[in-house]
């Protein structure tokens, strides 16, 4: 009940990697983590899925992002954050958007970047399209959500960036965790 926020339907679901007799693979990447839980997605009726990272701390109203996603008629919305000028963005996915906020370039952990706008690892995706992209990716043995879905489909799908102004911090390293 707590994780569903007292709802009868929907809510928050956390998926942990599970090795079983039927499934001997640990998650091979971010797309595989979703693919291994695809039956859950197929049984749901909600039109949208919010995907979040487990190594970030942030304050964000998902309803505002969902409204933006619907307004843009987006296939995928990437929540982005402008980092301070001069801040090292080489450990993030870096995005460039056009004047309509459509993502025109996505570089994963670039050595030199043309932008200081980073992906926060938070996405809203149409559920049916997510299932379709995950199945295609798995059929081809591709397991990374950013490389094999976002970057691959950026010119074929309507992928928009939503710039968050609220607090966001990545805690993927011990140092960043203690900060």
Residue ranges and their predicted role:
Residues 15-17, 79, 162-164:
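Conserved beta-strand termini and adjacent loop/short-helix elements that scaffold enzyme active sites
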């Amino acid at each position: 009940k707590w994780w569903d926020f007292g709802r009868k339907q929907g809510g928050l679901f956390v998926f942990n990697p599970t090795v079983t007799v039927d499934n001997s693979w640990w998650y091979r990447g971010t797309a595989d983590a979703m693919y291994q839980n695809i039956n859950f997605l197929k049984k749901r009726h909600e039109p949208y899925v919010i995907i979040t990272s487990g190594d970030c701390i942030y304050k964000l109203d998902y309803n505002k992002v969902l409204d933006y996603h619907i307004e843009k008629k987006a296939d995928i919305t990437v929540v982005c954050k402008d980092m301070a000028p001069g801040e090292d963005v080489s450990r993030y996915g870096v995005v460039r958007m056009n004047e309509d906020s459509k993502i025109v370039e996505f570089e994963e952990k670039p050595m030199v970047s043309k932008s200081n706008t980073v992906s926060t690892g938070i996405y809203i995706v149409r559920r049916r399209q997510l299932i379709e992209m995950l199945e295609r990716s798995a059929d081809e043995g591709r397991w990374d959500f950013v490389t094999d879905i976002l970057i691959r489909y950026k010119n074929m799908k309507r992928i928009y960036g939503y710039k968050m102004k609220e607090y966001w911090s990545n805690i993927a390293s011990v140092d960043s965790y203690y900060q």
